[in-house]
């Protein structure tokens, strides 16, 4: 990608001058990318981050914990196969670089499970892991029906009462909320309304 190498050179100079590696943004003429080269590979973004968001990303470098060593809350998920699913997800997200430092390996993961096997509880346990390990600040939970949104919000509120939550199908948006629940059409309308 054009611009990436030049942005990396600027980041090297800024690190020398200020003693801290910056978060890198670079365009290629059509798209813009963000790159925390100490942790994740680059990815496309739609705009720039605020000063507070950049500070949080830099702070996470020191406070982010290894997901592979997280102890799953057994009051949320009680079954061995659920623990195994969460552990495999954690291993999918994390790797070590050649020097042994923690690195992000993937930003997405997929669990496919049959009806009645505890998808909502496993999701709550994964959110618990990601928030307590300082990998996620906010979480968006999407469902195809209002009833499933309500059910998920109630389950998350029961198992993760320390995280604020909102159902966008019924409540007004609040930027400080940690857990956001919505249907696909509701969130698409919110996105379209921002354009």
Pin down the residues of each PLM region.
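Short, solvent-exposed loop/turn elements at beta->coil junctions and helix N-caps
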Residues: 168-172
